[in-house]
Amino acid sequence: RRRQRQMCIRDRYQKCVSMGVTFFDEFQVLDIKIDDGVCKGVVAYEIATGDIHVFEARAVTFATGGFGKIYKVSSNAHSLTGDGPGILYQKGIPLEDMEFYQFHPTGIYRLGILLSEAARGEGGILRNKDGERFMERYAPSIKDLAPRDMVSRAIATEISEGNGAGPNNDFVYLDLTHLGAETIKQKLPDITDFVRTYVKIEPIDEPIPVQPTAHYAMGGIPTDVDARVLSDANGTILPGVYSAGESACVSV
Protein backbone atom coordinates (compact mmCIF):
# COMPACT_ATOMS: atom_id res chain seq x y z
CA ARG A 1 0.00 0.00 0.00
CA ARG A 2 2.88 2.35 0.71
CA ARG A 3 4.18 1.86 -2.83
CA GLN A 4 0.68 2.41 -4.21
CA ARG A 5 0.44 5.73 -2.37
CA GLN A 6 3.82 6.78 -3.72
CA MET A 7 2.70 5.97 -7.26
CA CYS A 8 -0.55 7.91 -6.81
CA ILE A 9 1.30 10.98 -5.51
CA ARG A 10 3.81 10.84 -8.35
CA ASP A 11 1.11 10.50 -11.01
CA ARG A 12 -0.95 13.37 -9.59
CA TYR A 13 2.11 15.58 -9.34
CA GLN A 14 3.08 14.86 -12.94
CA LYS A 15 -0.48 15.64 -14.06
CA CYS A 16 -0.36 19.00 -12.25
CA VAL A 17 2.97 19.83 -13.87
CA SER A 18 1.62 18.97 -17.31
CA MET A 19 -1.31 21.36 -16.70
CA GLY A 20 0.96 24.21 -15.65
CA VAL A 21 -0.06 24.28 -11.99
CA THR A 22 2.11 26.58 -9.87
CA PHE A 23 3.29 25.18 -6.53
CA PHE A 24 4.15 27.33 -3.52
CA ASP A 25 6.29 24.95 -1.48
CA GLU A 26 6.93 25.52 2.23
CA PHE A 27 4.11 28.03 2.62
CA GLN A 28 1.92 27.78 5.72
CA VAL A 29 -1.68 28.96 5.40
CA LEU A 30 -2.60 31.16 8.36
CA ASP A 31 -6.10 32.37 7.57
CA ILE A 32 -8.89 32.31 5.01
CA LYS A 33 -10.46 35.50 3.67
CA ILE A 34 -14.25 35.42 3.80
CA ASP A 35 -16.23 38.55 2.96
CA ASP A 36 -20.02 38.62 3.26
CA GLY A 37 -20.05 34.85 3.57
CA VAL A 38 -18.06 34.26 0.37
CA CYS A 39 -14.50 32.95 0.02
CA LYS A 40 -11.98 35.51 -1.27
CA GLY A 41 -8.65 33.68 -0.78
CA VAL A 42 -6.08 32.86 1.90
CA VAL A 43 -3.26 34.45 3.87
CA ALA A 44 -0.02 32.43 4.01
CA TYR A 45 3.38 32.54 5.68
CA GLU A 46 6.50 31.82 3.60
CA ILE A 47 8.71 29.76 5.87
CA ALA A 48 12.00 30.48 4.09
CA THR A 49 11.69 34.28 4.23
CA GLY A 50 9.14 35.02 6.94
CA ASP A 51 7.07 37.02 4.45
CA ILE A 52 3.27 37.13 4.58
CA HIS A 53 1.43 36.61 1.28
CA VAL A 54 -2.19 37.12 0.30
CA PHE A 55 -3.59 34.81 -2.38
CA GLU A 56 -6.86 35.91 -3.92
CA ALA A 57 -9.10 33.08 -5.04
CA ARG A 58 -12.76 32.37 -5.68
CA ALA A 59 -12.38 28.87 -4.27
CA VAL A 60 -10.18 27.27 -1.62
CA THR A 61 -9.85 23.55 -0.88
CA PHE A 62 -8.57 22.46 2.51
CA ALA A 63 -6.67 19.17 2.21
CA THR A 64 -4.56 19.56 5.33
CA GLY A 65 -4.83 16.00 6.63
CA GLY A 66 -5.59 14.98 10.19
CA PHE A 67 -4.44 16.23 13.57
CA GLY A 68 -2.67 13.22 15.04
CA LYS A 69 0.17 15.27 16.49
CA ILE A 70 -2.08 16.44 19.31
CA TYR A 71 -1.43 12.95 20.72
CA LYS A 72 1.81 11.87 22.37
CA VAL A 73 2.26 8.86 20.08
CA SER A 74 1.01 9.17 16.51
CA SER A 75 1.73 7.78 13.05
CA ASN A 76 1.15 11.26 11.61
CA ALA A 77 3.76 13.65 10.24
CA HIS A 78 4.84 16.49 12.53
CA SER A 79 2.93 18.97 10.36
CA LEU A 80 -0.45 17.35 11.04
CA THR A 81 -1.68 19.52 13.88
CA GLY A 82 -5.18 20.34 12.62
CA ASP A 83 -4.37 23.72 11.07
CA GLY A 84 -7.07 23.46 8.39
CA PRO A 85 -9.94 22.68 10.76
CA GLY A 86 -8.51 25.23 13.21
CA ILE A 87 -8.58 28.04 10.65
CA LEU A 88 -12.23 27.41 9.80
CA TYR A 89 -13.17 26.96 13.46
CA GLN A 90 -11.85 30.46 14.11
CA LYS A 91 -14.22 31.66 11.39
CA GLY A 92 -17.16 30.18 13.26
CA ILE A 93 -17.45 26.89 11.38
CA PRO A 94 -18.53 24.17 13.86
CA LEU A 95 -16.27 21.15 13.49
CA GLU A 96 -17.83 17.69 13.42
CA ASP A 97 -17.13 14.34 15.11
CA MET A 98 -13.87 15.57 16.64
CA GLU A 99 -14.16 13.07 19.49
CA PHE A 100 -13.75 10.13 17.10
CA TYR A 101 -10.16 9.13 16.36
CA GLN A 102 -8.90 5.82 15.03
CA PHE A 103 -6.05 4.18 16.92
CA HIS A 104 -3.94 1.59 15.14
CA PRO A 105 -3.24 -1.21 17.64
CA THR A 106 0.33 -2.02 16.67
CA GLY A 107 2.54 1.03 16.46
CA ILE A 108 6.15 0.53 17.50
CA TYR A 109 6.43 1.54 21.15
CA ARG A 110 7.00 5.31 21.57
CA LEU A 111 7.79 5.82 17.87
CA GLY A 112 4.37 5.67 16.20
CA ILE A 113 5.68 3.66 13.23
CA LEU A 114 2.89 1.29 12.27
CA LEU A 115 3.34 -2.45 11.94
CA SER A 116 0.78 -3.70 9.45
CA GLU A 117 -2.08 -6.05 10.28
CA ALA A 118 -0.30 -8.39 7.87
CA ALA A 119 1.84 -9.46 10.82
CA ARG A 120 -1.20 -10.77 12.67
CA GLY A 121 -2.68 -12.03 9.41
CA GLU A 122 0.35 -14.28 9.05
CA GLY A 123 -0.13 -15.57 12.58
CA GLY A 124 1.50 -12.97 14.81
CA ILE A 125 0.29 -13.06 18.42
CA LEU A 126 -0.20 -10.22 20.91
CA ARG A 127 1.06 -11.04 24.40
CA ASN A 128 1.06 -9.18 27.71
CA LYS A 129 3.92 -9.04 30.22
CA ASP A 130 3.17 -12.61 31.35
CA GLY A 131 3.31 -13.97 27.81
CA GLU A 132 -0.45 -14.54 27.78
CA ARG A 133 -2.26 -14.42 24.44
CA PHE A 134 -4.76 -11.98 25.88
CA MET A 135 -6.90 -11.47 22.76
CA GLU A 136 -8.41 -14.89 23.47
CA ARG A 137 -10.25 -13.20 26.34
CA TYR A 138 -11.49 -10.20 24.33
CA ALA A 139 -12.33 -11.87 21.01
CA PRO A 140 -12.48 -15.64 21.60
CA SER A 141 -13.37 -16.57 18.03
CA ILE A 142 -11.13 -14.28 15.97
CA LYS A 143 -8.50 -13.49 18.61
CA ASP A 144 -5.64 -11.41 17.17
CA LEU A 145 -7.51 -10.89 13.89
CA ALA A 146 -10.15 -8.71 15.54
CA PRO A 147 -10.79 -5.22 14.06
CA ARG A 148 -8.50 -2.33 14.94
CA ASP A 149 -10.82 -0.74 17.48
CA MET A 150 -11.30 -3.99 19.41
CA VAL A 151 -7.59 -4.77 19.49
CA SER A 152 -6.65 -1.22 20.50
CA ARG A 153 -9.19 -1.25 23.34
CA ALA A 154 -7.95 -4.65 24.49
CA ILE A 155 -4.33 -3.46 24.59
CA ALA A 156 -5.34 -0.27 26.42
CA THR A 157 -7.27 -2.35 28.95
CA GLU A 158 -4.33 -4.68 29.53
CA ILE A 159 -2.06 -1.71 30.13
CA SER A 160 -4.52 0.06 32.45
CA GLU A 161 -4.93 -3.13 34.50
CA GLY A 162 -1.19 -3.46 35.01
CA ASN A 163 -0.57 -6.21 32.48
CA GLY A 164 1.59 -4.11 30.18
CA ALA A 165 5.26 -4.92 29.71
CA GLY A 166 8.37 -2.86 30.39
CA PRO A 167 9.39 -0.82 33.44
CA ASN A 168 6.34 1.42 33.05
CA ASN A 169 3.94 -1.37 32.07
CA ASP A 170 2.90 0.69 29.04
CA PHE A 171 3.20 -1.65 26.05
CA VAL A 172 2.49 -5.21 24.95
CA TYR A 173 4.36 -7.57 22.66
CA LEU A 174 3.74 -8.55 19.06
CA ASP A 175 5.25 -12.02 18.88
CA LEU A 176 6.38 -13.34 15.49
CA THR A 177 9.07 -15.72 16.72
CA HIS A 178 6.96 -18.86 16.21
CA LEU A 179 6.46 -18.08 12.50
CA GLY A 180 9.98 -19.05 11.57
CA ALA A 181 12.75 -17.15 9.84
CA GLU A 182 11.68 -17.93 6.26
CA THR A 183 8.07 -16.80 6.72
CA ILE A 184 9.17 -13.58 8.38
CA LYS A 185 11.76 -12.82 5.69
CA GLN A 186 9.51 -13.61 2.74
CA LYS A 187 6.13 -12.30 3.90
CA LEU A 188 6.93 -9.51 6.36
CA PRO A 189 10.05 -7.78 4.98
CA ASP A 190 8.92 -4.20 5.66
CA ILE A 191 8.00 -4.97 9.26
CA THR A 192 11.29 -6.68 9.97
CA ASP A 193 13.23 -3.81 8.39
CA PHE A 194 11.40 -1.22 10.53
CA VAL A 195 11.99 -3.14 13.74
CA ARG A 196 15.65 -3.82 13.08
CA THR A 197 16.27 -0.21 12.08
CA TYR A 198 14.34 1.67 14.74
CA VAL A 199 14.36 -0.52 17.85
CA LYS A 200 17.37 -2.75 17.14
CA ILE A 201 15.35 -5.92 17.72
CA GLU A 202 15.60 -9.11 15.69
CA PRO A 203 11.93 -10.13 15.28
CA ILE A 204 12.92 -13.67 14.36
CA ASP A 205 14.20 -14.11 17.91
CA GLU A 206 12.43 -11.47 20.04
CA PRO A 207 8.86 -10.13 20.40
CA ILE A 208 8.27 -6.51 19.35
CA PRO A 209 7.06 -3.84 21.82
CA VAL A 210 3.89 -2.18 20.48
CA GLN A 211 1.17 0.17 21.70
CA PRO A 212 -2.04 1.75 20.31
CA THR A 213 -1.07 4.68 18.12
CA ALA A 214 -3.18 7.66 17.00
CA HIS A 215 -3.62 7.16 13.28
CA TYR A 216 -6.69 8.64 11.58
CA ALA A 217 -9.07 11.52 12.30
CA MET A 218 -12.70 10.58 11.78
CA GLY A 219 -13.87 14.13 12.43
CA GLY A 220 -12.92 17.46 10.96
CA ILE A 221 -14.37 20.11 8.67
CA PRO A 222 -18.07 19.39 7.99
CA THR A 223 -18.69 18.76 4.29
CA ASP A 224 -21.31 17.30 2.01
CA VAL A 225 -20.61 14.46 -0.46
CA ASP A 226 -19.40 17.02 -3.01
CA ALA A 227 -16.68 18.28 -0.63
CA ARG A 228 -18.48 21.60 -0.03
CA VAL A 229 -17.95 23.00 3.47
CA LEU A 230 -21.07 23.38 5.62
CA SER A 231 -21.21 26.46 7.81
CA ASP A 232 -23.85 25.36 10.32
CA ALA A 233 -25.87 22.44 11.65
CA ASN A 234 -28.57 23.09 9.04
CA GLY A 235 -26.22 22.17 6.21
CA THR A 236 -25.76 25.69 4.82
CA ILE A 237 -23.02 25.67 2.17
CA LEU A 238 -20.13 28.12 2.54
CA PRO A 239 -19.63 29.33 -1.05
CA GLY A 240 -16.20 28.67 -2.53
CA VAL A 241 -14.82 26.66 0.40
CA TYR A 242 -14.13 22.93 0.07
CA SER A 243 -12.39 20.23 2.07
CA ALA A 244 -11.10 16.83 1.00
CA GLY A 245 -9.37 13.87 2.54
CA GLU A 246 -8.74 13.41 6.24
CA SER A 247 -9.38 17.07 7.08
CA ALA A 248 -12.98 16.66 5.88
CA CYS A 249 -15.87 14.96 7.66
CA VAL A 250 -19.14 13.80 6.12
CA SER A 251 -20.00 12.00 9.39
CA VAL A 252 -21.70 8.60 9.41
Residue ranges and their predicted role:
Residues 87, 93-202, 206-209:
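An anion/pyrophosphate-binding glycine-rich loop and adjacent beta-alpha core
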Residues 66, 103-108, 214, 247-252:
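Glycine-rich phosphate/pyrophosphate-binding beta-alpha loops
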Residues 17-29, 95-98:
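A conserved beta-strand/loop element that lines the FAD pocket in flavoprotein oxidoreductases
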Residues 62-75:
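Flavin (primarily FAD) binding-site architecture
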Residues 2-9:
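Short, small-residue-biased leader/transition segments that mark boundaries at the very start
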Residues 24, 30-39, 44-45, 187-248:
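A glycine-rich dinucleotide-binding beta-alpha-beta segment and adjacent secondary-structure elements
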Residues 48-59, 237-240:
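Core beta-strand elements of the Rossmann-like FAD/NAD(P) dinucleotide-binding domain
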Residues 57-59, 63-64, 244-245:
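Short, well-ordered coil/turn residues at beta-beta hairpins
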